[in-house]
Regions:
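Short, surface-exposed amphipathic charged segments that create phosphate/polyanion-binding patches used
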Residues: 57, 141-147
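Short acidic (Asp/Glu) and glycine-rich catalytic loops that position anionic groups and cofactors
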Residues: 71-72, 132, 147
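Generic structural signal of hydrophobic/aromatic residues within well-ordered alpha-helices
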Residues: 21, 28-29, 136-139, 143
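RNase H-like nuclease fold core
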Residues: 2-11, 16-109, 113, 117, ...
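Inter-helix linker motif
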Residues: 123-141
């Protein structure tokens, strides 16, 4: 923190802040959700982080963003894993179901192999749509190769 912000913060202060925030984070992560979301975007973002040993490693942050029936965006969940995979997405979808989500009308996802099958196993009536951003990125590869 001192390098980034110019402020020195003691280990006791960091522990006190963490102790106050963790219960709120746990409550947010386990809160009940709406039963239906018309649209849900699911994607993982990869970050370099420092692990317990002080080594720089890459971790996947799984993000689930939904549009509720009133048209408002809601961050439904954030999950951390070593890497992105359909099996972990299945556990994310199961968590959403356990927290009250009964149906997703449209799931916007990247082209990860096995991801549509994971969605269909938990939400069999959900239409799966490849995210427009991912469609453009994938198309550009072929355009550049053709030039």
């Amino acid at each position: 923190m001192e390098e980034n912000l110019g402020n020195r913060v003691s280990a006791d202060t960091i522990s006190a802040i963490t102790d106050r925030v963790l219960p709120e984070i746990k409550a947010w992560k386990s809160r009940m959700l709406d039963s239906v979301y018309p649209i849900v975007w699911m994607d993982a973002i990869h970050y370099k982080v420092t692990d317990e040993r002080g080594c720089a490693v890459t971790r996947a942050i799984y993000n689930v963003l939904g549009i509720d029936r009133d048209g408002h965006k809601e961050l439904l969940g954030m999950y951390i894993s070593r890497n992105e995979g359909a099996n972990f997405w299945l556990s994310v979808l199961t968590d959403l179901q356990n927290r009250g989500v009964e149906d997703i009308l449209i799931a916007c996802i990247d082209g990860l192999k096995g991801f549509p099958d994971a969605i269909q196993s938990v939400y069999p009536n959900t239409a799966v749509q490849l995210c427009v951003v991912h469609q453009i990125r994938n198309s550009i590869k072929y355009v550049i190769a053709a030039l």
